[in-house]
């Protein structure tokens, strides 16, 4: 399987705590080949992801068969378990965090490295560009095969693309149906050949899962409402993330590649809950 194919559906590891190792192994054995984590002990157990990767490698699923993404998380998103010296300059913080990630993951490279969220809203500030320059250096070293940013708005994306030497290759955002599934950022990413990853597709949109029309489409396709949402995301060019802890749901999630939504259904879902 190519790295491009690996990346078509990502398994997210936030909030798995001590179950992280077993769940990552289960996800990969169920068919996932892309894993997302972060060097943020407050919400992720990156070292336990590394344990899972080591166990999988021992069973014949090697690192080069997997697509691995982690993140640099600014100090405001961390608890007391910081992976860097908070008194150091930001460039040093990025380097320390990245080195710690490679150690946790028992890897010599990652496929994608993200800034977990900007320091400033609604526009980027000096700190964001300082961090980005450090990430560019990691990319140029070959230790990160791509770099990107998460939790970002359209204004920030425009600034980053226009002012950076190395343009972002990945964006990861939470998607709300009532914001047209982050259409402004998605369209910007498409125009600039940036891969768009969508998370919280189900948890942020419970009203969509229970919508009568979604249930009707699911019945017609002989799938679940959750599969309809994930298939919609994939079909509009999004890379969906799931964090399910249920083996049956993992397999159902990967079943989205076995059917296709009509143009009419796609239009309905894209505009289902606009406010």
Could you tell me what each predicted segment is?
Residues 1-70, 134, 204:
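N-terminal binding-site loop/beta-alpha segment at the start of enzyme catalytic domains
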